[in-house]
Amino acid sequence: MSIVLAIETSCDETAVAIVNNRKVLGNVVASQIDIHREFGGVVPEVASRHHLESINACIDTAFEQSGLSWSEIEAIATTCAPGLVGALLLGAAAGKTLAMIHNKPFIGVHHLEGHIYASYLSQPELEPPFLCLLVSGGHTSFIEVRGCGEYKLLGETRDDAAGEAFDKVARLLRVGYPGGPVIDRLAKTGDPQAFKLPEGRISLPGGGYHPYDCSFSGLKTAVLRLVQQFETQGKAVPVADIAASFQYTVAQALTKRAVRCAGDRQLQTIVVGGGVAANSGLRQILTAAAAEAGIQVYFPPLKFCTDNAAMIACAAAEHFQKGDRSRLDLPVASRLPITQVQTLYTPLVPLKGKS
């Protein structure tokens, strides 16, 4: 049993959770979407201020939901990388302070590793090896998971992340923020075959294309030109059809690469994580293609696709059981490759008896 309290403040969600191994006992998320909507995106300074205002109440509520006391918490974890530095600092300072006050081990967690572990919360029997398709506003990666802290990056976006592309296309279509849910909703009433959009392949120096890397900047530009074409002609922009065609193209690009990657690496399972994992088009297309290839696919419940502390606590519990601990002077970092997760930890050295 490993009961962990975790704090997640890497971007614009103030989240606190208490998890016992892979079972959620308390989970609180204070969203800032409405606050940042008027700016069309996250303002780092505003995000940090609201983290400061919300975090104590979130901690109290998580304890109320769990019915536990501080004496029952075995470790305290916070997201330490990657993310907005000011936001990360706020969460890390809170977690480290609580660890010192209550004399608990401190565990820093890589945000992307949290997304990998999100599916464990609904599929507690899930075990490596598997391929993780990690798709969010800041990342699009194909990661081979061999164990806790054991990751190999097989492919990634060369420019815009998938979630970032959704936000930018939503802005081009003037349909609101955040772009992911809006595009998904519009796509349900549009024709995904209305417009043929570029998938965004990466050319190799010796010819051919990279099997797993992807690009979404060209797709975004194609949507821009399509919108401009209709506006120049004085015609109404077919927003739903463009949204559906865009979403279909992104889902197809991710699906082709994920299924091929899993097949090439002889992995029988694909785990999807990140905010874009909530997209209904991706869920439908990837599930169908994977089933045809004899591959099992797991998507997190919708509430665990976006940023939350339950996934951070789950990842921390695995590291805690492994004997990993973080120093209280561990710095936060705006960037840290998923392959460098273990740099966050100092192995637990057993105390030696007196000779």
Curated annotation (Swiss-Prot):
Name the residues that bind Fe cation.
Answer: 111, 115, 307
- Assigned GO CC terms: cytoplasm
How is the cofactor bound here? Binds 1 Fe(2+) ion per subunit.
SUPFAM superfamilies (UniProt xref): Actin-like ATPase domain
Q: Which Pfam families match?
A: TsaD
Question: Chief subcellular site?
Answer: cytoplasm
Its cofactor is: Fe(2+)
Protein location: Cytoplasm
Question: Where is substrate bound in this sequence?
Answer: 134-138, 167, 180, 184, 279
Q: Which InterPro entries match?
A: ATPase_NBD (IPR043129), Gcp-like_dom (IPR000905), KAE1/TsaD (IPR017861), Peptidase_M22_CS (IPR017860), TsaD (IPR022450)
Q: What is its EC number?
A: 2.3.1.234
GO terms of molecular function: iron ion binding; N(6)-L-threonylcarbamoyladenine synthase activity
Entry keywords, A to Z: Acyltransferase, Cytoplasm, Iron, Metal-binding, Transferase, tRNA processing
- Any single GO BP term: tRNA threonylcarbamoyladenosine modification
Q: Has the keyword NADP been applied to this entry? A: no
- What domain of life is recorded for the organism? Bacteria
The chemistry this enzyme catalyses reads: L-threonylcarbamoyladenylate + adenosine(37) in tRNA = N(6)-L-threonylcarbamoyladenosine(37) in tRNA + AMP + H(+)
By its UniProt entry, which NCBIfam families does this protein fall under?
Answer: gcp_kae1 (TIGR00329), T6A_TsaD_YgjD (TIGR03723)
Function of the protein: Required for the formation of a threonylcarbamoyl group on adenosine at position 37 (t(6)A37) in tRNAs that read codons beginning with adenine. Is involved in the transfer of the threonylcarbamoyl moiety of threonylcarbamoyl-AMP (TC-AMP) to the N6 group of A37, together with TsaE and TsaB. TsaD likely plays a direct catalytic role in this reaction.
Give the similarity note: Belongs to the KAE1 / TsaD family.
Q: What is this protein called?
A: tRNA N6-adenosine threonylcarbamoyltransferase
Identify the species of origin: Picosynechococcus sp. (strain ATCC 27264 / PCC 7002 / PR-6) (Agmenellum quadruplicatum)
Q: What is the lineage of its organism?
A: Bacteria, Bacillati, Cyanobacteriota, Cyanophyceae, Oscillatoriophycideae
Instruction: Name the gene.
Output: tsaD
